[in-house]
Curated annotation (Swiss-Prot):
It comes from Mannheimia succiniciproducens (strain KCTC 0769BP / MBEL55E). Residues 22-95 are periplasmic. GO terms for cellular component: cell division site; cell septum; plasma membrane. The gene is ftsB. InterPro entries: Cell_div_FtsB, FtsL/DivIC. Essential cell division protein. May link together the upstream cell division proteins, which are predominantly cytoplasmic, with the downstream cell division proteins, which are predominantly periplasmic. This is Cell division protein FtsB. Residues 1-3 are cytoplasmic.
Length: 95
């Protein structure tokens, strides 16, 4: 009877080891869950960025104002008979 209990205990320990440390065990599960959470956060951030870009594309396709704004800010273009003023910020170090 003692031998039977020893064998059952050994099998139980083997199963416990496999459960905690084996392939697809608890530690692998926790590691995979952390990776999934990290990827979900990254996907959320990328999805928000995609929405901003899609809105900008829609605005550029549909409206003239967005094109004018981009031309003014990025390329410093002006309309005919319009005066362009650039106001430089004062550098605090050069006072």
């Amino acid at each position: 009877m003692r031998l039977f209990i020893l064998i059952l205990s050994a099998i139980l320990l083997l199963f416990q080891y496999d459960l905690w440390f084996g392939k697809n065990g608890y530690l692998d599960y926790k590691e995979t869950a952390e990776e999934i959470a990290m990827h979900k956060a990254e996907n959320t951030k990328l999805s928000q960025r995609n929405q901003v870009v899609a809105a900008e594309i829609r605005d550029l396709k549909d409206g003239v104002e967005a094109i004018q704004e981009r031309a003014r800010l990025q390329y410093e273009l002006v309309k005919p008979n319009e005066t362009f003023y650039r106001i430089a910020k004062e550098n605090k170090d050069n006072r």
